[in-house]
């Protein structure tokens, strides 16, 4: 049987350009009967813009040519007879198969194999488009690996400098939308919270991250947590064969010297892959913050210098075994350590009225020991009995061990700096957390029009927290306690997607049953305080998408999601922060639930999103008066939040040497506070703007300029956040066919990234301010060697201009 001859480069380019011009006509043909199919990559994802050709046999006359859409789908008019189906796309082996056609039908999915080449054979003659931000179907993709963010240091630093993502001084991560944010890595939810989550993100090197995907309305296969949306950190996939090593080393400086290194080794065959990795980040991090409050007519001014001296270390091993196309086993184990001392120095001026200084409190927190040790272990198995069916099982175990020892001398002085008295406090909190999870997922795609997802998940969380508190060497039984928290979850979900020509409908439901138990044992009482809870909740989602043509798409999305309280926020005990401020948990916190609807429109490289969010049982940390001169911070369900928002994302190559992307958001917040005896409503508009520019300079140097701006906006309760923003600059250049790369960047050039806010509640007027060591200069060198198998190789200008 004769075969279609290899198509030379010029003919291939011409046909591909013609296919691009005729893309809208090809997509319009979906409304008609025809020959349908899908082209998938090695991970089972649809390949965009693959060239699909149909040639008659035996004369090899080319009958049809088209390209696949973003889901890897293609469509031909009906033909009768024997034909040769040929599929080509850069970076993958050419696919050819004899087929017989007689009527409209859906062909089986076609999986392309990556083309394996050596580094010395790769000749790049043009530059791939490098937008930092793109958007489609209501999702925003931040392309970390092709921007300066890959040199930022760790995952937490990447999130801090990513458009549309905010990270406060406590490490809390949020989006512009209402509610909390759930963090995923490669589609797997991180069950960690608070300090534990920050610890993990600080030990995840930015060099490992491929991209970040933000989704405000994910389907039911994702957990219900994250009422504001989810952030999915997608790590770089190993597309290398043989033995390969990559290593990077960086140094940074502004206020403190920092150094980070990571090393990754992999050995891959057709049947199995083994990977080892190590990274560390060493150096101090400085923060300055404070507040001014007027309580019952008396003013206090407090300023704090904070230096975090902890270092991070991480090591891991990955093993994957795939004996055939149907079975795959994956094992992963990592250990992360965040350890080291720390110190804060606080000076508080205490006034009688607003202008008469009467006392000065000087407090110091000396963290003589801080250690967070984290183990993550995962085992997963994937079975594909056929090309349209996939079953997967996974088991995860995460252990977190956190310890701290803090000495806190407090000294009181008169206005003329004469000593009055001093106290010496000591605290020793310990925290042990174990998280176990079992998951089973099922995916069935009988044809190109239907897809079914289903799964079950069960998790067990155990958190044991204890704290020893001493004053002047004597145990303070009123502030020493042991808090135990246990949580059991059983979840099940189903999602069905149906495509009719240009219309796609998807609906899903996730069910969650949660049982909680908490026990507080105080040293002042033999009786333990216990609380239990049982909840059954349903979380539906729905989306409808209409493909107007090849460049225009409109979608309507709805989802219901939640945020659960942090474990430590449920501890009802009272902790001393300094002699004028306290923190107390709340065992009666309820999850906050968000209903969200979004209308999304995509036109070529422009995406527009209009959304409305309603957050019930909203909880946040608030500051209230405590006695005549003290304040207490606690977390409460305080009412309802509503938000109307409009987002626009645009990315385009403006010239052959300039890639541009921008993200604009306009929002209107309504906080309806209704708790205890407090009733008040706060309304405020706000806006967000980010822009990223990538320039190709002479000598192959890439220059990147990125900036973000947040306007004045309503905070969590009665406070108002002041405007903030930052500008980053980056330079990088590669040698040796990309094996050697050097990057120089400066973050927050003008040192404008701050967390300032103010607010008034009853007889409390509070204004706080702060900033971290966000401005720094970083130099990073990356080197890799070995034989690589690239997922895509860009070889010619015409193909690259299409990207």
Regions found by a protein language model. Name each.
Residues 637-713:
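Gram-negative outer-membrane beta-barrel transporters
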Residues 314-338, 366-521, 547, 551, ...:
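Face-selective signature of the C-terminal outer-membrane beta-barrel domain
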Residues 224-231, 239-289, 309-313:
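Outer-membrane beta-barrel translocator/receptor signature
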Residues 75-77, 155, 161, 188-216:
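Short acidic/polar hinge/loop motifs at secondary-structure boundaries
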Residues 431, 481-487, 533, 562-616, ...:
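Outer-membrane beta-barrel signature, preferentially recognizing the C-terminal barrel domain
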Residues 57-73:
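Short, acidic Ser/Thr/Gly-rich low-complexity loop/linker segments typical of extracellular
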Residues 51-55, 88-90, 106-148, 168-170, ...:
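Short, acidic, small-residue-rich periplasmic hinge/interaction motif at the N-terminus
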Residues 108-111, 155-158, 173, 197-201, ...:
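N-terminal periplasmic accessory domains that precede
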